Amino acid sequence: MPSAAEGTIKALVFLRGGPLDLFGEPAIVQRALENVELCVLVDLVESPVSQRADWVLPGVSFAEKDGTFTNSQGRVQRIRKVLTLRGDTREEWRILQELGNHLGVLPARDPDPERIFSRLAQAVPAFSGLSYTTLGELGAPIAGATADVAVG
């Protein structure tokens, strides 16, 4: 955010909105939102970010996508789609893939959430050794999570 606030970043893409303090010092976030040439938000609900965004794309809820999430205690769990997407809604990873394709920074591929998670586990040490198989039904702690998270 500081780089956007200083004007060295031209665009911000938010995958969720929320109160400004969610993204850092509110004054810096506000200045960043004012200084960027383009602000895009993917979300389900209105927020201070949506009020400033140049483009608001329809987001999806956890019930409309497959993937994983990591809770605040460092436990990674699977989420499974139980609702069908409607209209032009897309999962965040699809939006980012399409944006990357259009900007020429990502090759045209059709990844899936499991492959994306596999790449994350290869690239980020805290997720090393985790896979959809090791997550199972109860999830698993990332490296460095506390013992109470590891036990469940």
Language model regions located:
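Non-catalytic alpha/beta scaffold blocks inside enzyme catalytic domains
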Residues: 1-131
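Long, compositionally biased stretches
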Residues: 45, 130-152
